Design a protein with these regions (language model features):
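Short runs of predominantly hydrophobic/aromatic residues within well-ordered alpha helices
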Residues: 26-34, 67, 71, 89, ...
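Short, positively charged interaction helices/loops
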Residues: 39-80
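Short, highly charged low-complexity linear segments
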Residues: 1, 70-77, 90-101
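N-proximal short alpha-helices
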Residues: 2-3, 66
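Short, basic amphipathic alpha-helical segments that act as recognition/interaction helices
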Residues: 24-49, 105
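Surface-exposed, Lys/Arg-rich phosphate-binding patches that contact polyanionic backbones
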Residues: 1, 8-28, 32, 55-61, ...
Length: 125
């Protein structure tokens, strides 16, 4: 069972930039990125699973904490299939973080007041 993953370089750059401009910690941004990716009606594409590993190293406990089983269930619902532990972490978690970071970047760039905009998105979850 894996306990660490490395994001893509692009995801790390996005998380670093938003972390610096919004003063939110990386682990908070990672959870928001996962939420935005899961919120998407689009399934993960094959290319989402083939991003580089040149970004930040993240610990499983930091990402999912006590809600590990909940994250796995949400990802299984999104994928519409059972995920083994090896598929869930790091494969699916990394894919959702990398895709979600891009979505988070779009929300931050075009959403006006970032935190207010994210709370408005929550109403649609």
């Amino acid at each position: 069972m894996a306990f660490k993953l490395k994001t893509s370089k692009k995801a790390a750059e996005i998380l670093d930039r938003i972390e610096g401009s919004e003063f939110l910690q990386c682990y908070t941004l990672v959870k928001l990125a996962i939420a935005l990716s899961l919120r998407s009606k689009e399934p993960l594409r094959e290319s989402d699973f083939h991003t580089n590993t040149l970004g930040r190293e993240l610990n499983r406990q930091t990402i999912t904490g006590d809600a590990d089983a909940l994250y796995k269930c949400l990802m299984e619902l999104h994928a519409q299939k059972h995920l083994t532990d090896e598929e869930f972490f790091p494969i699916y978690v990394k894919a959702h973080i990398d895709r979600g970071a891009i979505l988070l970047d779009q929300e931050q760039r075009y959403g006006g007041d970032f935190l207010v905009h994210l709370t408005e998105l929550e109403k649609g979850l």
